[in-house]
From Swiss-Prot:
Organism: Ralstonia nicotianae (strain ATCC BAA-1114 / GMI1000) (Ralstonia solanacearum)
Role of this protein: Required for the insertion and/or proper folding and/or complex formation of integral membrane proteins into the membrane. Involved in integration of membrane proteins that insert both dependently and independently of the Sec translocase complex, as well as at least some lipoproteins. Aids folding of multispanning membrane proteins.
Compartments, as annotated in UniProt: Cell inner membrane
Gene of this entry: yidC
HAMAP family (alphabetical): YidC_type1
Protein name: Membrane protein insertase YidC
Amino acid sequence: MDIKRTILWVIFSLSVVLLFDNWQRANGHQSMFFPTPQTVTTTAAAPGGTPAGDVPKAAAPAAAGSQAAPATGAVSQTPASEKIVVTTDVIRATVDTAGAIVTKLELLTQKDHDGNPMVLFDRSLERTYLARSGLIGGDFPNHTTVFTASAGPRDLGTGGEVSLTLTADKGGAKLAKTYVFKRGSYVIDTRFDVTNDGAAPINPTLYMELARDGGAVEQSRFYSTFTGPAVYTDTDHYHKITFADIDKSKAHVPAPTDSGWVAMVQHYFASAWIPAASAKREFYVDRIDTNFYRVGMQQALGTVAPGASVSATARLFAGPQEERMLEGITPGLELVKDYGWLTIIAKPLFWLLEKIHKLLGNWGWSIVALTVLVKLVFFPLSATSYRSMAKMKDLQPRMTAIRERHKGDPQKMNQEMMTLYRTEKVNPLGGCLPIVIQIPVFIALYWVLLSSVEMRGAPWLGWVHDLASPDPFYILPILMAVSMFVQTRLNPTPPDPVQAKMMMFMPIAFSVMFFFFPAGLVLYWVVNNCLSIAQQWSINRMLGTNKKAAAAK
């Protein structure tokens, strides 16, 4: 039965590793064990970082009197564009008058590994990630048209908001885009005003899309999560779309509806176009060029008579995946925070972690406190497991004697083993079931710590300055290895020397793997191991005291 317990531990360990590897591949990353050769691809981009001819086509043919959507983004005799920088207390946005799009968005409250503001939207040689919009259904202003910016303040200053309006006139349609930036908000309110200044009716369609390259944001396979488009509607709810599915033309796109939004998701951060409620919208997702993708929506604005105007509004979110903030923006947006398939357990754990943080004010100590609470909840199960293991350890000499006495008769050996278990009232698998029950909680807590942007840049104490990054001095992984080694010494020693060596090797293997895990996760494991050691030692001591008392009588 010791062999069965050892085998179960090995299966559990391998299951955790293989489950993680499968989850990595499901989120578009390479397998740790079966990596596929990466093909380096380049994007054939037009000047400015985006492919030519990427203006979306209208969902339906243009009405009579309207021109077809442009096949390319080429514009003759275009005036020179300029870049306008708008700054608030939380973001710094660079708006290019070419297309009236945000070509760079810096999150001032989030820092990258070099201590600079985290860049979300970007158009550079290294990457392209843009939120674009415009009109189709005719030769109308789109994201390749050069707009004219209005005069006005560019910094928030002491005010509550700052706005920027950009206008362009083309093909009989005048489009005015107005961006409103608000204090403390990662949401940019956007208004589209369309005026027909031609002599014939027009039928413009507004499009809003998020376009980016398919490159991974963070290369470490140990804490990278899903990168790619996502779509939400009240009917289909939330679903992610992998770049691989887009390449294979297998991407699922919801049917036209009057609810929902599109998003582009990456580790810790996301962006989303959120149209006004009840506005009819059609979704699309495709690959524009090699390694360049987009997800978007089209909203028909109806027939606009000469001299008439029509307006539409939307919100553009670009910021961190802070769950409570996302819940307050629009229904379902909090789902961009990826908890994996154990969301039903992970969400309550994060809620509890938040409550603890409000009391302690430090995410590291909050993880410690949460670990203690989880350990208290599982205390009865753990105690049962440790009692069973302690009894098995006491029976070890007698079990070894039975094996030696009946080494040539396995059936007789098993019969005597079962008799011994019944006599001593020991369940040989009693130490395993409580461990199995706790596995989903551990995995859920793993995803909580992995996906929570609150851990990013959050210090604990001393050398740990970022709970979302690996321990820079590997102190926590070493402590974890030591704690696992102590645990193996408290457990019954497997009778087979090979199994015993395997159990001694496991702490080393796990500690090496955890060198690359976020410090917050390793902190949880270390604290959990220390609590387990204390509990197991106290139970072993209590059973030893009871045994001495019984012998004295």
